[in-house]
């Protein structure tokens, strides 16, 4: 059986890079438009895949492995920027996870923790990326402040306080209603929002509280040609 070649992708020298310091705690978010040359080939690769699987973690949808050529493009383009913005050098990154991702979980099927902004890890030396391979009509990503604690990020020193505050809300019957958060609520304030745009990359610390902008009326299509397709990447210390 013939093996399809991996998509050819590389950093776009004309990419537009912006670094924002969001919220009162001024956590960095990097937004890169027109990130890669060959992004269309990535979308075609995802559409051709038959291996999207139900996610076993808290991602609300389906995932499939991104190609090795994508990882190589990240390796070739981002280390210098990451060190300048986040103070993290390549030797601190022990593993990288890159996955095609599709939001497919309907609001009524969400676990309560999927209805609120989340952190990906408690290590500020770990980073997350979302690379949109869809348009703005499918929703971007927002960053949030937890009102009771004032936290906009949750590191190891804040974890117990944050989880304790959420537990207190649950005991008091203040659970979020079924559905995705997409703006201000009694518990959380939106402090920054980025639209999806084809070939836009967002890069931020795993500790930052964030959530996808999944609006009412969203079509939870499982076809990557039609759904909210992205590549989600984690740069991890272990």
Residue ranges of each PLM-predicted region?
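Fe(II)/2-oxoglutarate oxygenase catalytic core
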Residues: 1-238
